[in-house]
Amino acid sequence: DYVLISSSAVYPETLPQPFNERQPIGKNSIWGDYSSGKVGAEVCLTSRYPNAYVIRPPYLYGPMQNLYREPFVFECAELKRKFYIPGDGEMKLLFFHVEDLCRFIYSILKQHPDNHIFNVGNTQPVSISTFAELCYRAAGAPLEKVFVKDHPNQRDYFSFHNYEYLLDVSLQNEIMPEQKDLYCGLKESYEWYKSNKEEVRKKPYIDFIDRNFQ
């Protein structure tokens, strides 16, 4: 059996949401070359092995996360910094724990479902404001929020694109209806982060905040 861990970035941002597995795939301008690469990988694999399984996750998280996404929030929490949140904080993010990803791969290899393309992800999205609250809570730190209303590029100071999208994960839920609680997963992520900070690929968000928002 072939299983490709693709990405929800294969859905062009212009498609109706929530994205579902029946929609056409193509380049998403938010994700650029990353999106194009994932689309190309899907086309290549499925043209050669039509019975391969393709899995399209949203933001993956959990222990061994070396991208400076939730680790950025953890660092701010440890430093007891205010946390700068884009807009009104209501933009939604969709996550999926790496352990749930592994459980799902195991399930499809064991069950061999008729469907071969699956969106995966938590059933419920979370606002960026609530996400910050959960990360600070996982780190055991109080949170003071600052909402940024007038800066054009949130990636200067925040670790997620200004892009909200939702996935239809009903096919996933027929096979694996339960996902790890987001707070519990973030707590696991923080425990890994504490001992592995040197593994994280940092970006200069804090420097930008100190130079522009203080």
Task: List each language-model region with its residue ranges.
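NAD(P)-dependent short-chain dehydrogenase/reductase
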Residues: 51-93, 135-136
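Active-site "gating" loop of Rossmann-like NAD(P)-dependent oxidoreductase/epimerase domains
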Residues: 7-32
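Alpha-helical substrate-binding/gating segment
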Residues: 74-84, 91-126, 133
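Glycine-rich Rossmann NAD(P)(H)-binding loop
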Residues: 62, 86-91, 118-126, 150, ...
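Mid/C-terminal beta-alpha module of Rossmann-like enzyme folds, strongest
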Residues: 107-157, 206, 213
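Conserved C-terminal active-site "lid" loop/helix of NAD(P)H-dependent oxidoreductases
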Residues: 153-178, 196-198
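Active-site Tyr-X1-5-Lys
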Residues: 29-55, 69
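Amphipathic terminal alpha-helices
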Residues: 182-214
